[in-house]
């Protein structure tokens, strides 16, 4: 509804670790774990304010991103989603997405908390299916973690799963991209989002550029095709 509708984005600024390409506001959970509930306290106040300001409009979609929303515990996820459901009228909401994101943050208990609260879409984001690249960019999970997290979500009856991939990551060749796409195709996600690597000034790839200076980062039309 372009005239009377709006979409709601809620950011959870915590991650298991900081990816080398990331320039978003994100804090390592290991350091900030004891402040997550404080963040949710503040977030609930913003939710109340937003609900009051937009009460006369139709809420069409909700996206909980980050960061990594599934760094929250099952109880914290339940708290946040219940707050959203209590504060907003969701009768016109067509899609409610939670970016499960990093496979190393996904558990059965967290997925069950999402399922119980009626989340209609999740995202399981490997970025690549090449283990060497995952290690280089600081993602502390394996390719198999991605596969098992995806299969777990399917087992729990999630029928709208997105997967994010990034083209142009360090040391990735065209054959690596083909390999990633073959593995993703086997999983058969409901949609795939392809990002082209853009190195921003706040990313570790820029801040510690000497560490990555000898690494190839190539993204061509052939890769995208």
Regions found by a protein language model. Name each.
Residues 5-38:
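Canonical Radical SAM [4Fe-4S] cluster-binding loop centered on the CxxxCxxC motif
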Residues 26-225:
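Conserved non-cysteine loop/helix-boundary elements of the Radical SAM core domain that shape
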